Regions:
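Short beta-strand segments
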Residues: 17-60, 68, 74-78, 88-89
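Generic structural signal for secondary-structure transition and capping sites
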Residues: 18, 73-74, 116, 143
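AMP-binding (ANL) adenylation modules
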Residues: 81-83
Length: 153
């Protein structure tokens, strides 16, 4: 088992269709964990080794949106399912953006393209950007990343 470099973290998070397991804080202080589809917003990051913000869409009155509205501290874990196994856990703050539908659609299509492919991106993008959908951006504060957890080396 070894720590990932910043470049390895960025590459790992961008690859394939790994879902993120998002943890938010419930009203009673307990945790709420759900899988999410996401992409990275690299507009304000410098270089390929920087991951930028994590972006996803959700319904404005979903449990995760309500939780973020009360307490914006979140964590997200992205892991693979193939030995020797690796993971990235990001601790950060989330911000809900109530953009116009056109902006939410732009991001929803990017997310859908990653998980459903180019042919389905438009349909899934529209489905996940309708009335009441919002954009959430997570700004990373701390990252823990390990690779080859089950390796004998």
């Amino acid at each position: 088992m070894a720590e990932m470099s910043k470049t390895e973290i960025a590459r790992f998070i961008r690859q394939g269709t790994f879902t993120g397991k998002l943890a938010t804080v419930k009203k009673d202080g307990g945790s709420h964990v759900v899988p999410i589809w996401f992409v990275l917003d690299n507009e304000n990051s410098k270089g390929r080794s920087r991951i930028g913000n994590i972006v996803f869409t959700t319904y404005s009155v979903s449990a995760k949106a309500k939780n973020i509205g009360r307490n914006n501290r979140v964590s997200i874990c992205i892991d693979d399912q193939i030995p020797p196994f690796s993971f990235v856990t990001i601790f950060g703050t989330a911000e809900i953006h109530t953009y116009k539908q056109k902006e939410v659609l732009k991001w929803a299509k990017r997310i859908a393209k990653r998980y459903m492919g180019k042919d389905e991106a438009e349909a899934y993008g529209k489905r996940n950007s309708g009335e009441g959908e919002v954009l959430v951006k997570i700004r990373p504060i701390k990252i823990i990343a390990e690779k080859d957890i089950a390796s004998w080396d």
